[in-house]
């Protein structure tokens, strides 16, 4: 199963020991193939530094964990503008085009429900896939 995690899921994985942290642990354990979108990585690093003011050592540590969990890194070549309400989300949709799931807490993405064959779901819904 190929999965793209949005920035908000990655940030939450490091700030709380909840569902998003469990999802990242599952990626590290190779329970699914985590596809990292380069713009998501860039936004993740920016938010860690600017909003949460983590120092470079902490940012490097977090980056190493995400890298360890990553199965593939994708750089969207042509993010389509106007696909969703937030124009910046076009890049993640292009990255997720061949994934089975895009896991996010972003309502601008969730409202779409699907992008091609990719199901767009909340972290809680994704975690439930592992409860059987």
Question: At which residue positions do the language-model features occur?
Answer:
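Residues at secondary-structure transition points
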Residues: 18, 35, 57, 61, ...
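Conserved beta-strand segments of alpha/beta enzyme cores
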Residues: 33, 71-72, 119
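Acidic, PIN/NYN-like endoribonuclease modules and their adjacent C-terminal/linker elements
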Residues: 82-83, 107-132
